[in-house]
Amino acid sequence: ISFIFLASCSVEEQIQQEPDILDDIYFTEFMPCKAGPDFNAENMTAMISEWQKLITAEELLGVWGYAPAADTNSVKDTGWWELQWSSQDAANTAWDQWMQNDRANAWQEKYASVLQCDGEARNPFDAVIPIVPTAYGETNDSGYFYSEVHICEFNEGYSKDDAIEFL
């Protein structure tokens, strides 16, 4: 008895193309905030929980809160609320809607003794993030992280486009 055994193998090489992170430019606003007399973890948790229920803008891509790590930092006791939007137009529209929202105004009044943020003093800029979020490992369970900011200005004759090209 003769057997013929045929085997065929196929190696299909798949190359997963990662998106170019430099293609994403976010409109980001930093809003200064001051802790009030009723500022504590419990009140902040309640405040944020209620705030999340008020947010309807899908263009709001991310929000982070920053508290000073030391009283020697450049902004003293000012905390920051970072809002990351899909565009400046989306941010402006959402802010207009927020200002006209009776529930949002009631929320602000309710938590005025916990945290006071100055929406008029928002510091806007375009953000390009040249690293993937997991570049330094997985995010810890607490959600806390350290960040540091260095303010720079473009040299004469250079622009944002030159900086992005450099990245």
What spans do the regions from the language model cover?
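Short S/T/G/P-rich N-terminal loop/turn motif that feeds into the first structured element of a domain
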Residues: C9-W80, Q84-L167
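Bacterial N-terminal signal peptides
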Residues: I1-A7
